[in-house]
Design a protein with these regions (language model features):
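Catalytic phosphate/metal-binding cores of nucleic-acid and nucleotide-processing enzymes, i.e., regions
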Residues: 1-133
Length: 133
């Protein structure tokens, strides 16, 4: 059985993440704020979809819905970092949905990515399918 949830976007890409990490004199404060905001928003999406907590090992399938071809697919996929972090158990000072304990090798069985452009009235974002392994 798999579980699916939607994260409205567009999510920040690799270039935005690097720019935020280099901001504020390279101290990473802007990246930390970006990560905290997006992780918290994604946790809400996970909880709203009622993805079960306490899974041992999962694989994630990402279906990225982009508004245009402005960003390369590999740039867009960088946002998976925020999604994996949101799936983890909450830690001191960090939001987490508790679907898995951590996003390390023992819990992360990998991921698959597909990309498509917005179709009609659809909004940009990402569909995430969590598959227990």
């Amino acid at each position: 059985m798999s579980f699916r949830f939607w994260v409205p976007g567009p999510l920040p890409g690799q270039n935005e993440m690097i720019g935020a990490a280099k901001g504020c004199g390279g101290r990473g404060a802007l990246y930390a704020a970006m990560k905290a905001k997006w992780t918290s928003d994604i946790v809400f999406c996970i909880l709203a979809a009622r993805v079960p907590k306490g899974l041992t090992r999962i694989r994630c399938e990402f279906e990225w819905v982009s508004p245009s071809k402005r960003h390369d697919p590999d740039n867009i996929e960088a946002a998976q970092k925020f999604i994996w972090d949101a799936l983890c158990a909450p830690k001191k000072g960090r939001a987490g949905a508790g679907v898995i304990a951590n996003d390390g090798w023992s819990q992360n069985a990998g991921s698959a990515h597909t990309h498509r452009l917005v179709d009609g009235y659809e909004k940009p974002g990402v569909w995430v399918t969590v598959v227990p392994v």
